[in-house]
Structures are given as structure tokens and as C-alpha cells.
Amino acid sequence: MTGMRGLSVFISDVRNCQNKEAERLRVDKELGNIRTCFKNEKVLTPYKKKKYVWKMLYIHMLGYDVDFGHMEAVSLISAPKYPEKQVGYIVTSCLLNENHDFLKLAINTVRNDIIGRNETFQCLALTLVGNIGGRDFAESLAPDVQKLLISSSCRPLVRKKAALCLLRLFRKNPDAVNVDGWADRMAQLLDERDLGVLTSSTSLLVALVSNNHEAYSSCLPKCVKILERLARNQDVPQEYTYYGIPSPWLQVKAMRALQYFPTIEDPSTRKALFEVLQRILMGTDVVKNVNKNNASHAVLFEALSLVMHLDAEKEMMSQCVALLGKFISVREPNIRYLGLENMTRMLMVTDVQDIIKKHQSQIITSLKDPDISIRRRALDLLYGMCDVSNAKDIVEELLQYLSTAEFSMREELSLKAAILAEKFAPDLSWYVDVILQLIDKAGDFVSDDIWFRVVQFVTNNEDLQPYAASKAREYMDKIAIHETMVKVSAYILGEYGHLLARQPGCSASELFSILHEKLPTVSTPTIPILLSTYAKLLMHAQPPDPELQKKVWAVFKKYESCIDVEIQQRAVEYFELSKKGPAFMDVLAEMPKFPERQSSLIKKAENVEDTADQSAIKLRAQQQPSNAIVLADPQPVNGAPPPLKVPILSGSTDPESVARSLSHPNGTLSNIDPQTPSPDLLSDLLGPLAIEAPPGAVSYEQHGPVGAEGVPDEIDGSAIVPVEEQTNTVELIGNIAERFHALCLKDSGVLYEDPHIQIGIKAEWRGHHGRLVLFMGNKNTSPLTSVQALILPPAHLRLDLSPVPDTIPPRAQVQSPLEVMNIRPSRDVAVLDFSYKFGTNVVSAKLRIPATLNKFLQPLQLTSEEFFPQWRAISGPPLKLQEVVRGVRPLALPEMANLFNSFHVTICPGLDPNPNNLVASTTFYSETTGAMLCLARIETDPADRTQLRLTVGSGDPTLTFELKEFIKEQLITIPMGSRALVPAAGPAPSPAVQPPSPAALADDPGAMLAGLL
């Protein structure tokens, strides 16, 4: 930019502007001048073009949109001289992104610079690609960049940039780096003596092993040697020593790469690595220099992560915990934070919790730290390390801290205290005390789920009921109590207040008086609960109390004209019921026991924001036997729970619905009787009128379909888990069958998802060949192990699935390409037998791969001159088949045309003289048939849309039959998954036509492809 007077003047003018408006006017004026000059190419010299492009970059840096001149910037890249080429590369990398169309024009020029002999030009090109290179660059330039990286004639500066450039290209297109042969070259790069090249190569290695660690197993001992070299400070230049620490960046990268490999089996390599880790653990201390502290602790905490990954001996684990205990007591807040965070991660390791408990007092002290982020980490750590032995101490500390905690933390704090009290309660009375204290101290932050839960425990444990009623009576004596306390106390006293009748101040009349004092202070949603309690107290008054009856009736009559419909209805109905005598007692009988169910509080805690390493807590919960309170005398989940009101459970009793439920949709899973979520019975307290019925009078539909022996057959929404390894079941996210049917119509999307993993698919189809990529993403901060994926192919497909890594690292995604070759026509599909292990929980599922018959169809629109000669050329059966199809889902002709187009059978409009008919054409590709033309005619009856005549013809009899059956399956309402998952050889028989079911139509979002299998 030296000597560019116009550029200097423009920058000075902008800086001298007095306000934003003046600056904008000056910029607009300059943009207009640049636009005019670019239009007149005859006077646009290379110098002027360079100057104007610099001005555009400066304007862009000021925050203004520059939507022209991009071509001029790109054209400078091809300039023969360095000054112009430098400007072109810099401005292009700043103004354009990887998806810009102009960038494609520069690919050849960039490639010429990369393969050229000018190292300066090579550096410019590699820098551009490393910053904004996309998929197109990856496909075109990856081999050339690889050659530069392994070239012995290139200077280290170029090779460093080549490594980082290749890293960018790999991230944009993992297929750009071919594993075959490159793994050995990668291992050779790790022998590099130049630390700059070695650091860049290690960054590349981290990305490569995260995608496929097995292919790069030869790099594992090389990473250990790098750590040995750095730990001994051998051959480390001064410029790579940071505050006395040999290349901390390279140490961190090498240890991170090692965490993607399984446990090291070679004894000598393992011994050498542990010696290095021991040296790091022993040699790190807190010093006053901030920069040295940051570097040394970055290395240390990465070493701790590696120690946990390697499942080191207990002695080293104890040393790690002791070191972290030292860090959480230092004055530097950043180190305290990292110490607490890593100690929380240590909870994932077995046999370490008892060692962490030794630092419990210091962790509790961190709850009072001025820094809120440290307090949050301390809360997470206390929550994770709690068990039966220390639950009382930790919960009491949390209750004390609740009074002084920030409002932003109180909801999370109360939720975790409630969960710990429930899971590790030594006795139920202590649990009731804790929950009532929570409500008393932080009522605004206690969700309804918490007091619903305590009511369930009290209801299900008769021995607890008198104690809970007496505690509720004590809290009602307080002058000011929270409304949530009024709710829970009113409910408990209404149900069990009569158990205190012999105690002073606990008669029905006295309980009514003390509760009625709170009525003016509560909001509208609480009044219905109080009205229900008044009715219960009136019923339990023995002998009948005329004075109490008079007071209660007065309240009911007062609210008979309430504007709130719920309150009005309760008041009217309770008033009338209270006149019925014995019938009143039958209707308001004592609440029966609730069914046993999994606590919703734990699931809610997992969704709390800003918590560290919830996965550690979940993993430990899976590895240890549960200490949670068990509800007394539980009822079956799918049985008849005794609610406050009679809910209508979703279900269908018609035979077709049952058949559809019994069929196996995508992701068919074994019957392990999962905990089916049941309706929240207590939430009905705040909903419509809650009138109890005797347990025997309430009938319920079962949640799932009924098997042959009348047992609920829960086959959907859970996962195959071997009984000996199962600790709990996973709850699927989304409907797997719907996901599969959606992928039958599109080429990318999610195939399967649960709380731990998401499996997505992206596909490309060309003729009889398909290329799919399975994306498996670990959603947790803990690795998924024992990952296995096996393809069960049908006879008509040839499939080749790339190996899936045994371990998916935390928060990482791995990809596994799948090549599909269609040999002959068939409607059978391949099945992916997928399994993984999270902690000790093994999850397995069989997932249908959306490589369906329609994927090998290519849309083809024919004119009448092309269609009818081909149609007449196809003789009768078996090349041309005709069938009257009944039980068709009634569709208008445009809807039917859209349905056909969606699976690549193209409607040819205007060819059939009858406007109620459709004709269609498509091309089918397979290895045996080649490109085969397929024709179809659909004759509909306007008077009866539930039947039609379907004619399909092609040059191959098997193709004709399979395509006819495929189209018929799309038109008929067939229970999903009625075909077998494992395909049988030979053509499948025609499915039986079934009449349409309104329930099926309403419940089947994937109706277009219903019954594809």
C-alpha cells in the first residue's frame, strides 16, 4: 500500500468525519467512484485496480456492504506479479465465503500456484484455501496439497501451511483424504524434527483419528514418542519454548489425539506414556506468572483427561484427585474453576468417588465463592458426588445455601436438592422434611413436579401419612407461607388430616379455619384445591359437625357464581354432593396408591442450562445400583392408576390399529417392557374438576397393543438391551418409522435419535448406484464405546459399508460411507443392525436403510408421440400387468399426481383422453436390466375414489410385478411395517388389500409410503 496516495487520502477523509452520517456519505461517494471506474475497463490499469480493491476491503472492514467488484478482486489472483497477486488473495479471502460462485472461477489459478515452484505464491494460495476453501476446493486440490505436505524439497513454512490447508479440506469433505496409503505417510510426518510442521501435522492427525482411529493406529506410538521428546526437552528450539514449557500446544494436541484411540495394549508404549503423564502431574504447580500458569495448566488438564481415558491405576487416579483438590483451594479463580470442572469429570471413573469425598468440605466452601461460575461448578460437583453416605450433609448444605443463593441459581438448586433427597433418603420422613423446607425457603423456584412427587410418596406409604399431615399442620401455623406450601398442605390435610383428629388443634373444624385463613391470599389456580380440601374435611368430620357444614356450604355458595368455570363447577358439584350423605363418602373416598414411575425430576435436571458434565452423573447412575426411593406396593404402569380424575389415555381398540401397532416399524426393538410414560395424575389438581372414583369403578385402556396372551406388547420406542447388561432403557426422540418414510422421499435427514446418539443420512443416487453417508453424532460429553454397525443386505442389493469406529468421542461426529449397487428389481430393503454402549447400558436397534425401489427410478416425461408406441410395444402378461385395486385412500387427481411424482414416477399430463385417468413414465436402473423404461396407467372412478384400475408395463416381468406392487402399496392403507424386516428371496406376494381405517389415516404421518416394508 506504500505510495497509494488516493487510498491514504480516502482513509484520512473517513477518519476526519465528524459523525456517522458524514462517514456514510463519504463511503457512498467512494463506492460510486469505484463502480464507475470498474465499468470503464480501458482506463483500469493494474495499479488502479489494486488501489480500488484495497479501498473496497477498507470499506468492508468499516462494516459496509460491498456487493460489487468481487470479480475484479478474484481476477487479481491470476496476476503474474506478487503485489497484485497478494492483493487478490487477501481481498478475496476477506470479501468472499466458501459458497460464493466467483470463488469457483479461481480454482484453476489457485491450483497452478500450489503446484508451481514459487514458494511465495504457494503460501498465498494455501492460506486462501485454508481460510475459505470449501467442498469444491477439497475435490480439486486435496491431492496436490498432500504432495506438498510430504515433499522433502519444500521448506517447512510451506509444509506447515499445507498441513493446515489439508485440515480445512478434510473438515469440508472427509473423502478428500484417502485412508489407503495416507495412514503410513501420516505416521512418517510424526517423525518430523521441525516442531512447526509437527504441530500442524498433529492438528491434522486429531481430525483424522476422530473420524477413523483404526486406520491410523500406527500413529499411536509416534504420539507417545512426541510426548517423550517434549517431556525431556530434547531437540526443542528456543522459539518453541513458552515460559520454560516445551511447545505446550504440541503436547496438548498429541494427548488429545491419543484420547481417540482405545486403551493402549502394548506394555512398553503404555509404560512410556504413563511415565510422561506422571512427570506432567508431578511437575505442574501454581506460579505467579499468569501466562506460564495458563500454559502449564492447559497441558495438565489435558493430561488428566488422558489419564481418565486410559483407565489408569488407582494410585495415579488418587494422585490426580489430590492435585485437583489442591487446585480448588488456590486463590486464582480460573484454576479453581478448572479444578472443580475436572473433578466433576473424574466422577466418570470408577472407584474414585470415595477419594473425591475427602475434599467435600472444600467443595462446599466453593459454594460461597464470589464468582457465580465457580459456585455453579461446585453445585454440579456436589450433585454428582452425592450418595447414601453423604446425602444428608450435602442436602443440608444446599438448603442453607438456598437462602443466600442468586435468584438465577435457585431453581436449579432446589431441583437438584429435591432429586438428591428422593434418590438417597435414609427414610421417608427426612425426604418429606427436605421438600417442605425447600418449598418454605424457595417457593417461587419450586416447580409443581416437586410437590406432585412428595404427594405421590405420601399417598403410597401409609406409615408416612400421619407424619406428613402433622408437618403440613405445623407449616400452616406460620403467618406468611408460600402459595405452593398452601397447595401441598391443603392436599395432605384434606386426605390425611383425619389421622390427626385426636391431637389438639387438629379437628376438622380447626383445620378448616386455619386453611380458610389462607384463602384470600392465594391465586385462582389454588382455590380449586382448597375447595376439594373443604369437601374432604366435611366428609371426615365424625360425628357430623353442623357448624362446619354451615361454614363450608357458605364457601361453596359464595363461589357458585364465580367467573372462573373450574371454581364454579367445583363449588356447585361439591355443594350438591355434600347433601347426598353416603354417596358423598363414596365419591370422595381416600386416594388409592399411585403407580410406580420414573421421576420426571431427573429428566428435568438434565435439561437445566449451564451445568457441567451431566454425562458423568448419568454414567455413574447407570453403573451403580439405584438408591432411589421405591414406591410402596406399586401398580403396573399400564394398569389402572387411580387418578384424581379419569384421564382418557391414547390407544385404539380397533383390530387394524392393533395390527398396525403389532407390526414392526423402522427401528424394530425387542420387548423389554419399558417404563411407558403415564399421564401426570397430580397435574389434574390444577386442571378440570377432580372428582375421585373408587378404584374398581375406573377402567382404562392399555397403552400398547395386546399380544397373543393379553400382555401389552411394547415394541416401539425402546431399544434392544441384553437383560444381563441392561441398566435402563433409552427413550427414543421422534418417530423412527416417520423418519424412515421421510427419507424414502428425500436424500438427507435424521434416521435415528436417542438421548445419546443421532444417526443421519445423506445420499446421492445415480442410475443403479447409490452412495450414502451415515453420520453418527455423540450428543454426550462421554464417549460411546463398543459401536458396531452391520448391514443385513437383501439379495437384490450389493452393499459395502466402511468400518465404523469402535468409539465415538464426546461431542464428535463420525462418518461411514455406504456404497449401494442395485442388481435387480425388488421391494425389499437393507437393515442396519446398530449397537453401542453407554456406560454399562447396551443399546441396539435394527434400522431400515432407505435404499428403496423408488431410489433407482429416474423421472422421465414423455410426449404422446413417445408414450403410445412404447405402450403398444409392450405385450400382455407378464410384461404388462393389470389389477383392479380396492381400498385405495381417496385422493383427488392432483394429490395422486403429487404422490406419484414424489417417488419419481412422472405423470405425463394430457396424454389420456379421459380426464379421470393418469398416465406415467419412469426409468428404472439396475445391474441386470440396465436402464429400463416403465409405463403406467391409472384409471379412476369419480363416483368411487376408493378403487381404481392400475396397469403397469416394462420390458422385464420381475420389474413390472415389483413396480405394480410398490405403487399399489402407496395407494392402499396398509399397516406400517407389515413386510418382514429380513427380506426373503424371490418376489414378494401381493399384499392383501385392506379397507381404509380412519384411525390409520389420522395417525400415519408417513401415509404416502405406508407399508413400504
Swiss-Prot record:
Pfam families: Adaptin_N (PF01602), Alpha_adaptin_C (PF02296), Alpha_adaptinC2 (PF02883). GO terms for molecular function: clathrin adaptor activity; lipid binding. Keywords: Coated pit, Endocytosis, Lipid-binding, Membrane, Protein transport, Repeat, Transport. Residues 663-675 have a biased composition (Polar residues). It is found in: Membrane, Coated pit. Belongs to the adaptor complexes large subunit family. This is AP-2 complex subunit alpha-2. It comes from Arabidopsis thaliana.
